[in-house]
Structure formats: structure tokens, C-alpha cells
């Protein structure tokens, strides 16, 4: 068996085309979707992520605003900028790129963003709504995974799903979304005993731990759907400098029925769902204007 590849680039391009049409319709009605991005410090990876988000906004017809702060900025200055953006009716989404320098309390910063502009889906109120199965802005990576499962024709209801990783950004919300969709979900992590026992039971396996090529083919149930959220740059060996996921793609593809590659899998859909949340926020504003 050789797995079918679930192409995140192709799906992302299709969804972004639809979002561009929605953004254009909003602009014609006098509401141009707008995303404000705050970047603190000079983390190279964060800078790349922000550039990619801004570029994606431009292509989709979404206005973007970028605010850069030095790494040693007083936290109060960033909080003041968030308050300013919260009050700006022309801004529909506010995003603070993580991680933040040590002088910041990340939870306080995320809570400072108005719920209706929290297009990253990290505000506690949005997380609470998600846990209750209520309408909310969904965290972008788990939301993107669900869209990929849907596009791949994967039956989630009744499936055994295993999530490797319990982060607030991916693991926990991923488990909630799968639960809300009717899957029986197991969350595994660094303290899990006999991880492979759990992964071999999974009809749907989501890896999100940040360990390169950690999940190997012998840990996967034959015919399983494997979603690789990880993105790691190898630092040694013949593949040094290359990007890879948390799954050993070569061995996994011989066991799984469907698998996402890295790069070109979940990553593009993460940014696409950020655009989707921003457009949805703008549409809510447009509806409120009648």
C-alpha cells in the first residue's frame, strides 16, 4: 500500500480563491477586510511567518497592517497598540505573533484582544465556545486539519482519532474539534506510557509535537489517515537544512491510506484559515450594518 497524498497547497489555493471573491464582495459593499499583525522582537521564524501572512492577505484582497516592536519593548506599549486596534472599526482581525519575549504574559496579551477580532482563536472565550461546540473563531491549524479531512473524504464520525501533543495552539483544540465531529479521541503526550499502543489504534492520527520524523511506519495502523502538523528543520545528517514533519514520511506512506506531506500539507492551510477567520469577521461587521 502506498498512501494517497493530501495536498495542502492545492486545497489552500482553492479556498483562497473563494475567500478572495468574498473579500471583493465585501469591498464592493464598503467593508474591506483588514488584518493587523503585531510582531515583537527579531525571531527569524516569526518574521517569516508574518511575511507569509501579509503576502497571503495581499493576494486575497485583505488589507494588512504590520506593527513591529523591539524585543525589549515595555509590555504596556504593546497592550496600548492592541487597545487601539480593538477600537478601530476598520480592523477586523488582530494577531500577535507568538512566541513573545519573557517580559510578556502571553495569556494576558491574548486576552487583551477583543473576542470578535481574535482571528487566531486563542482568546479564552473562543476556546470555551469551542469546548461547548458553539460558534467561535477556531484556531487556524486545527481548523485547517478539519478542512483537509473533509476535502479528503475522511469519515470522522465514529473514527478512533489519536492526537500526539497537547499544546493550547494545536493539540487541545484539535482534540476538541475531532470530538465535536463525533470521533472517539485520545490525546497523547510526553507522559503517555506506550505511545505506539495508542497510535496503532488510530483511524486518524494527528502528530503535533515538534520532533522530526518521530512517528514511524511501525507505529501506524494499516490504512490510517496520517496528518502531520510538525515542521522541523533538520540540523545534521545528509538531509541537514531540509524541512520535515513529525512523521517519518517514507515509512509512513507505505502503511497509511492518506497522508499529508511536509512541506505542502497542513502549513498552507493554517494561513488560509487565518484569512478565512478575517473575512468572516468582516462579514459579521457588514451584516451588522444591515
Curated annotation (Swiss-Prot):
Entry keywords, A to Z: Amino-acid biosynthesis, Histidine biosynthesis, Hydrolase, Methionine biosynthesis, Multifunctional enzyme, NADP, One-carbon metabolism, Oxidoreductase, Purine biosynthesis
A Pfam entry, by short name: THF_DHG_CYH_C
Reactions the enzyme catalyzes: (6R)-5,10-methylene-5,6,7,8-tetrahydrofolate + NADP(+) = (6R)-5,10-methenyltetrahydrofolate + NADPH; (6R)-5,10-methenyltetrahydrofolate + H2O = (6R)-10-formyltetrahydrofolate + H(+)
GO biological process: L-histidine biosynthetic process; methionine biosynthetic process; purine nucleotide biosynthetic process; tetrahydrofolate interconversion
GO cellular component, one term: cytosol
Gene3D superfamilies: Leucine Dehydrogenase, chain A, domain 1, NAD(P)-binding Rossmann-like Domain
Coiled coil residues, start to end: none
Cysteines paired by S-S bonds: none
Enzyme Commission number(s) of this protein: 1.5.1.5, 3.5.4.9
GO molecular function: methenyltetrahydrofolate cyclohydrolase activity; methylenetetrahydrofolate dehydrogenase (NADP+) activity
Metabolic or biological pathway, per its Swiss-Prot or TrEMBL entry: One-carbon metabolism; tetrahydrofolate interconversion
UniProt-annotated binding residues for NADP(+): 165-167, 190, 231
Quaternary context: Homodimer.
NCBIfam families xref list: PRK10792.1 (NF008058), PRK14186.1 (NF010783), PRK14189.1 (NF010786)
Function of the protein: Catalyzes the oxidation of 5,10-methylenetetrahydrofolate to 5,10-methenyltetrahydrofolate and then the hydrolysis of 5,10-methenyltetrahydrofolate to 10-formyltetrahydrofolate.
Family: Belongs to the tetrahydrofolate dehydrogenase/cyclohydrolase family.
Protein name: Bifunctional protein FolD
Species classification: Bacteria, Pseudomonadati, Pseudomonadota, Betaproteobacteria, Rhodocyclales
